[in-house]
């Protein structure tokens, strides 16, 4: 949780939380938790070229019952077709893998990493993969090493 408090009360709140066993988290810790939770972040895992469904945001970001909105035609087309060509997945990645690292299979580029974090569970990343590779346990090349799909996050064009 995020707590917002007046500056003059921040130290008292920190001390009270510490007495209850809470520990402060830094930005790297928060990033690791986000990546482990499979939550896409705009500017890292999403940009205007991505469909909300590709990033696993169908239920959180789209109302299929509302009237007109920017991008409605593209979202509707993907929904009617019933499938997407690429989508967000969570992967275990090798040391040295970073955001922007291409993901490959059979010598072909099939995706790229968008966020990478060191976590208690290892080096974990979010990235986009082509549809044929949306399988937990799927192995793809990641730079000089290999990445393994841990979780498929993409929602395949399903109405919310």
Protein language model regions, located:
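Acidic-enriched, low-complexity/disordered segments with a strong bias for Aspartate over Glutamate
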Residues: 2, 8, 28-29, 45-47, ...
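Short, charged, solvent-exposed linker or helix-capping segments at domain edges/interfaces
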Residues: 14-15, 46, 138-139
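Short helix-capping and hinge/turn segments at secondary-structure transitions, especially at repeat
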Residues: 18-22, 40, 44, 73-83
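Short, conserved active-site entrance elements at the starts or edges of catalytic domains
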Residues: 33-57
């Amino acid at each position: 949780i995020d707590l917002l408090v007046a500056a003059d009360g921040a130290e008292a709140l920190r001390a009270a939380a510490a007495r209850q066993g809470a520990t402060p988290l830094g930005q790297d810790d928060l990033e690791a938790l986000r990546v482990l939770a499979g939550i896409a972040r705009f500017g890292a895992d999403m940009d205007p070229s991505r469909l909300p469904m590709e990033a696993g945001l169908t239920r959180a970001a789209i109302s299929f019952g509302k009237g007109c909105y920017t991008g409605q035609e593209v979202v509707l087309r993907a929904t009617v077709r019933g499938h997407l060509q690429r989508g967000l997945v969570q992967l275990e990645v090798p040391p040295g893998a970073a955001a922007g690292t291409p993901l490959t299979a059979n010598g072909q580029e099939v995706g790229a990493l968008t966020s990478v974090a060191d976590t208690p569970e290892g080096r974990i990343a979010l990235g986009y993969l082509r549809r044929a590779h949306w399988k937990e346990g799927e192995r793809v090349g990641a730079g000089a090493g290999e990445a393994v799909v841990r979780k498929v996050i993409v929602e395949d064009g399903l109405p919310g």
